[in-house]
Regions:
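Juxtamembrane boundary at the C-terminal end of a transmembrane helix
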Residues: 123-132
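Physicochemical signature of membrane-embedded alpha-helices that form the seven-helix bundle of GPCRs
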Residues: 7-10, 50-53, 83-86, 111-114
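Alpha-helical transmembrane segments of multi-pass membrane proteins
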Residues: 14-17, 86-91
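Core segments of transmembrane alpha-helices
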Residues: 54-67, 119-120
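Cytosolic, membrane-interface loops and tails of multi-pass inner-membrane proteins
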Residues: 20-51
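Alpha-helical transmembrane segments
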Residues: 3-18
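Interfacial loop-to-transmembrane junctions
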Residues: 93-118
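Short alpha-helical packing/oligomerization segments
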Residues: 66-89
């Protein structure tokens, strides 16, 4: 369970970073001290930050549930670390591309590719475990 716990903590911490970015762009009193006087927020920038945050929330829970189930059924710890590292790198790339950059093509595509590779690795492992 330690592999899942570690990556759940890392992904949760990154989720908070992305959430604070959204709060900042919305002009929340929580992040008011970060605002520059006369700062104008681009609505597209806010929308992208919201999607960067939302996208992590859409993928991470399913990944972590599948990860925990595999870990509890005795999957290789090395394999789980590899899948989690790939998935987490993808989520970081995608989240940064969406939430902090205006032009993000390569980072965004690379992020989704790594996200899918990590998730597909777990899916295949789960199916093989069921079939064996």
């Amino acid at each position: 369970m330690e592999v899942t716990l570690l990556f759940a903590a890392i992904l949760s911490a990154f989720m908070i970073v992305l959430a604070v970015r959204v709060l900042d762009l919305r002009g929340s009193p929580v992040t008011k001290s970060f605002h520059r006087p006369g700062r104008v927020i681009d609505p597209l920038e806010l929308e992208r930050a919201i999607r960067g945050h939302g996208n992590l929330i859409e993928y991470a829970p399913l990944f972590l549930i599948l990860m925990l189930l595999l870990e509890l059924t005795g999957a290789s710890e090395t394999f789980l670390y590899i899948c989690c590292t790939v998935f987490t790198a993808g989520r970081f790339m995608h989240g940064i591309a969406f939430s902090f950059m205006k032009k993000n093509g390569l980072l965004r595509i690379g992020g989704m590719t790594l996200t899918f590779l990590g998730l597909i690795g777990l899916i295949i492992s789960a199916l093989l475990k069921i079939l064996s």
